[in-house]
Amino acid sequence: MNDRQANKHSPQAGLTGETACPTSEGALTRKLAEVLAAATYGDLPADAIIDTQRSVLDWLGSALAGSVAPAARMAQRVVAALGISREATVFGAGRSSAAGAALANGVASHILELDDIHKGSTVHAAAPIIPAALAVAEREHADGKRFLLAVAVGYEAALRIGEAVNPSHYRFWHPTGTAATFGAAAAAGSLLKLNAAQMLDALGSAGTQAAGLWEFNADGAMSKHLHPGKAAFNGILAADLAREGFTGASRILEGDRGFFQAMSESHDASRITDGLGTRWKISENCYKLHACCGHTHSAIDLALEFRRERGWTAADVLEQVADIRVETYGPGYEIVRNSAPATPYQAKFSMAYCVACALCGVCFSLPWSFGQAKAYPTVRVTVADDLTAKYPAAWPARLTVTLRDGTVITRSADFPRGNPENPVSTAELEEKFLSLVGPVFGPAIAHRALGACTSIEDCADMAEAFSRIL
């Protein structure tokens, strides 16, 4: 794999709440299905192929490392108890049906909070889409190019639909469980070579299963991990049903009682059609370098930069700093506002705690433990209107540190590391992969899995390649 080029299309500015679509909105779902079904590997630009390979690499590291977590083991036991066919790999737990493997691997993918994110849609696309694509690719003995195409097609559906309903959708719904159900169905449908009518049915059946509520964040419940797993499972189910002739709602997006009306206060259908078939959304993908909520990442980067510049220890920070304030954007604040997390998972969704830990030298590139910073400064978190105005095209933060001698230092950032606008190299993603997989499965397996990822384009049979990585 080569590095992505720095000059990437970035997500457009916030939604207007108006519906604007060059295609009649009454034909919106059908138009999307036609483009997804017709896509071929030759349609993918070179950059999109590279970005798809990078996304698979980034996903696999999180999925393998997460597969030994308690929540992943629970999902694996449930899948094993179903006692169904052995069509696809369950990381760290043998084999299951394609849908069962996708469920278990989807859960594992999202546990560490190191899987990718897309700014405009707020979808963690890899965790639901790639497990669905890999499981069906194994079952169908698809080659690597068919698999990569399916992943890109899945991202295309999920990210465009997520952008169309955000930001209002995000108030209650977790787009990784909702919009990505469409993406998983599209990826599975691509591998099954569904025609346009069948793809339309698959999208219809996917949409009626789309779910995932933010209430998990109130107590750090494992339900968040279930969202991508169930989206992957439901996507395969929708595509398999469509192949059999099972019909789905033909206007599941734009219908009077469809996805748009049910799950958002406003929508912009042009987000689905703008550049459809020519501009691939996977090239807008963002990679996470910190194992916590993406809304904290710009602020964490600023805190780490502040500490590095001064070479301070945690004791120095506590001694020298009088006040710390982080300003962020409104929708992100609603997710990371908890200033007194009581559990490890709540800590990952606490801006104040994450920034305090960063200032005290906690490394977020690996899974980190709650309470790792034994003493840490108080961080005040507020919403800034100018930063909210930049969202979701940017995920900005402003950090103001006041020292005890009266010095005030203010830094700001619009894009954390790992965004297309602030990119990481493929070498850095490979280093992240090895740092996640090596400690869990050993360096030999880590390098073997890395090799499988970097050679996917030339793979003749995904089942043969991925059944041997563990």
Task: Give residue ranges: language-model regions.
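Active-site nucleophile and cofactor-binding loops and adjacent substrate-binding regions
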Residues: 121-127, 147-151, 169-181, 226-228, ...
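Active-site cavity-forming subdomains of large catalytic enzyme subunits
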Residues: 140-146, 163-172, 185, 189-202, ...
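Hydrophobic alpha-helical hairpins/lids featuring a short glycine-rich hinge
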Residues: 110-163
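Terminal-appendage/accessory-domain detector
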Residues: 1-11, 15-122, 218, 223-233, ...
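Short, charged, amphipathic alpha-helices and their helix-cap/turn boundaries
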Residues: 94-112, 148-163, 198-209, 262
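Well-ordered alpha-helical segments within folded domains of soluble proteins
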Residues: 127-134, 180-187, 233-236, 296-298
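Extended, well-ordered alpha-helical scaffold segments
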Residues: 28-32, 51, 78, 145-157, ...
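Secretory-pathway/luminal and periplasmic proteins that interact with or process carbohydrate-rich
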Residues: 66, 84-86, 157-165, 209-216
